[in-house]
Amino acid sequence: MARAPRWMLGWLLLACCVPHTEPLAVMSVDMGSESMKIAIVKPGVPMEIVLNKESRRKTPVAVALKENERLFGDSALGMSIKTPKVAFRYFQDLLGKQIDNPQVALYQSRFPEHELVKDEKRQTVIFKLSQTLQYSPEEMLGMVLNYSRGLAEEFAEQPIKDAVITVPAYFNQAERRAVLHAARMADLKVLQLINDNTAVALNYGVSGGKTSMPLHSFSFQNIMFYDMGAGSTVCTIVTYQTVKTKDSGTQPQLQIQGIGFDRTLGGLEMELRLRDYLAKLFNDQHPSKDVRKNPRAMAKLLKEANRLKTVLSANADHMAQIEGLLDDIDFKAKVSRQEFEDLCSDLFQRVPGPVQQALSSAEMNLDGIDQVILVGGATRVPKVQEVLLKAVGKEELGKNINADEAAAMGAVYQAAALSKAFKVKPFMVRDAAMFPIQVEFTREVEEDDKSKSLKHNKRILFQRMAPYPQRKVITFNRYTDDFEFYVNYGDLSFLNQDDLRIFGSLNLTTVRLKGVGESFKKHSDYESKGIKAHFNMDESGVLSLDRVESVFETLVEDKLEEESTLTKLGNTISSLFGGGGHTPEAGENLTDSVQEEEESLAEAAKEEQGVKQGQKSSAEDAGEEQGEEKQQSPHPDQAEAVPPKEESQKNEEGEKSEARDPKEDKETVNEEELSKSSGAGTAAKAEEEKKIKAPKKQKLVHEITMELDVNDVPDLLEDELKSSMKKLQDLTIRDLEKQEREKSANSLESFIFETQDKLYQEEYLFVSTEEEREEISKKLSEASNWMEEEGYAAATKELKDKLAELKKLCRNLFFRVEERRKWPERLAALESLLNHSNIFLKGARMIPESDQIFTEVELGTLEKAINETTVWKNETLAEQNKLSPAEKPVLLSKDIELKIAGLDREVQYLLDKAKFAKPKPKKEKNATKSDSGKNATGTSESENTIPPTEGKQEEKPEDISPAKEPPTTEKVVTDDEPGSDSSSKKEKKPEAGGESRKNDEL
């Protein structure tokens, strides 16, 4: 099993602030078209790929649905060969698609065995197996996600609720919402939908591929990732660099610069062409047969085509063979790599397409690309690599990341970063939205001839490749009554006609505002600052309208106050950067700045990742949007698109200003020019004016009711979501009950077969009678016959009751066998403990009374325990020997264990006391006297001090030795006169005998 590099362990640290009652593990699911990879992070497991029940690192995305059975993974894949109609694969292509979408027709042509019907409410697709079995693609995906969570929980050995799920970068809003619906059906909390190309880039940035150091330690780089999977191809250009932030200093960052894709270019299309070619060869060999009309035979051919494609990637030719393909006819045909490449020649011509799209969207050329790295299983096809290498003009293609697992590992790193249970080193991720989004509205305008007409206006909300997560505010200045506007996709001319047809509706949402007129009537004394619509594109790339507000403002006179020196300085700086005048336009600009700053603060509080947009890039994006607004609308005060962190071009310190109409901009520019010409004099004049009159702005926000109509693919209603959740939960409960029943049936069968075999083993024959064995054998035979005749339809409870009945019948026999197995070991342990206890007791009683550390009661208690245990052992053994082996034993292993524990407790008590006992004061006094006599009393002193330590050595030599010498030695040295070292050494010599005895005892 592969493990994360050692340096990566330092990137992932468990946070200590999370309550232990909450699940700590998080997971990621790389949901590919053909297979999925699951990864987890939990305490002690930094980042690991989950193994499925077959111990494989990737699991087929397949679901098999029968009347009373549901299979996943390899089991479902096997069912696709036996019963293709009930096995479903590649259904992710149908997410967020209505029934008339070309992608639905393509799916039907690829898999004609499935019946697709229309959902009358949403106009989407439903798989119909029967009148009672009908499932939507979201429900299918929900089943797979729930299954993946089960695998992750089993691998992590704890519950998991939080997940990061990968989606293709080209998924639009409807497709992303469909994945979120599926996750909710599976009761998964989605921390983020991360684009699979972004997950790969993050994994490469964190790990540095197969290099020894992570990429963030290197300099600025542009990397192109070419990902060809089973269903589609995506090419991504990523910029890696280190950036400085105020809060965290220097941090690594990746930014998605450009993306190109081909929805239908992948390994599956190659396999389908190879399948059709094999079918043609079979029909040529057997003209009277048509294998194309047999779904089961075509499923076998597709499986063989998958194997053949893999083998031909390493061999020039290979023999395709299938036993019993159709009507028990075997199929065998030789296929060369050249034939395979000819079949897919037009597919290989499409390989450079995503590269050119990515370069175009990034506004780069190939000279700016440092490396091209391959991702995805289909990139292993040699012809793909050959064409791609020629298209990018590099010396070689990078293969230094795991093409199958990079996305799952990058996603699980992001899951750990978003989870509250872990703390990871920050790696800033700036993803990009592929498709531009704009706001459209219609307003009545007055022409030169005083006539009125309707004018359609468009404002860009998110440019193509705009970074996200990001919040935007649109301000409508000319509306005083209820109105509606539309959120649609922007210019998609970069897509070809096929992609546009698959893309679906270009209209996202119709927003109707209620209560605008009432807010103006209610606050007629206030000055209107417009109707502000707050949009948010979250970490998953899903756009939402958070709220709509009607903003009003008025000036309130304050009493004159003496300004402090610091306030004067601040006002001077503000006047220099913001203009010195107090025209009404300047007042409006100041108000907008305050509102926008509040918005930015709200955004900062909401961002959970800590991913911050660079102020410079945000300012550039804002400038582009403002410029486009000016070009498209002759009445620019009708609406303004405002990025949340727009930086003023004049203020390098990050002051924020809201987009203004040309009139306001013009007047502001004039004020700035005046400020430059007048210099400090103008600033001083402005200070004097502020001293005379210092108005205070009072802002009032009125919430506007909004009604949303989804125009692309209608979302599931809350009741529909709950109904789907219950449907999936019922299926899960049914699966668990079925597994429990199968487990009970297997346990019963195993018990019957094992016990029938045991009855004639020697140890069972020895402890049983012929009558007992016959009775047990009869009951086992009856149970076996019952299993064959009725057991297949028996309920789980009935199976468990039958097993419990048989176990009860055999309980006494098994007990006698088990006891006799335990006797030798238990009795040997008891005998050993008795011997050691007797030796210890004898040694303790040999200690002179003057040095005795044990009381008579303590020694007597130990002696009593030894005697009682010995008597019990002898009497019980004698009584047991009188009994027949087939009778219930009186010598029980649990009783032996109790006796061992009781005796060991008494011995251990005395050993602990000896270990920590201190020499009596009498010994210290004798030692001092012996020191004064030195040579004359040296021998006598040694004799007085050695016996207690000898006693302790007999008790437990290895424990007493270190406790004996240091206290005695320290006492002698402390009491000695200076220069008595030689005497001390002489006094220690007799202890050598004690040490020798200690070694002998050991």
From Swiss-Prot:
A GO CC annotation given for this chain: endoplasmic reticulum lumen
CDD domains the UniProt entry points to: ASKHA_NBD_HSP70_HYOU1
Protein name, per record: Hypoxia up-regulated protein 1
InterPro entries documented for this protein: ATPase_NBD (IPR043129), Heat_shock_70_CS (IPR018181), HSP70_C_sf (IPR029048), HSP70_peptide-bd_sf (IPR029047), Hsp_70_fam (IPR013126)
Keyword Flavoprotein: no
PANTHER family: HSC70CB, ISOFORM G-RELATED, HYPOXIA UP-REGULATED PROTEIN 1
Domain of life (superkingdom): Eukaryota
Gene3D superfamilies for this protein: 1.20.1270.10, 3.30.30.30, 3.30.420.40, Actin, Chain A, domain 4, Substrate Binding Domain Of DNAk, Chain A, domain 1
Keywords: ATP-binding, Chaperone, Endoplasmic reticulum, Nucleotide-binding, Signal
Region of interest (Disordered), ranges: 576-698, 918-1002
SUPFAM superfamilies reported for this sequence: Actin-like ATPase domain (SSF53067), Heat shock protein 70kD (HSP70), C-terminal subdomain (SSF100934)
Main location: endoplasmic reticulum
Function recorded in the entry: Has a pivotal role in cytoprotective cellular mechanisms triggered by oxygen deprivation. Promotes HSPA5/BiP-mediated ATP nucleotide exchange and thereby activates the unfolded protein response (UPR) pathway in the presence of endoplasmic reticulum stress. May play a role as a molecular chaperone and participate in protein folding.
UniProt record, GO biological process: negative regulation of hypoxia-induced intrinsic apoptotic signaling pathway
Residue window of motif Prevents secretion from ER: 999-1002
Family: Belongs to the heat shock protein 70 family.
Composition skew (Basic and acidic residues), residue ranges: 643-675, 951-962, 983-1002
Segment forming the signal sequence: 1-23
Biased composition (Polar residues): 933-947
Subcellular location: Endoplasmic reticulum lumen
Organism: Gallus gallus (Chicken)
Annotated gene: HYOU1
One Pfam family linked to the record: HSP70
Any one GO MF annotation of this record: ATP-dependent protein folding chaperone
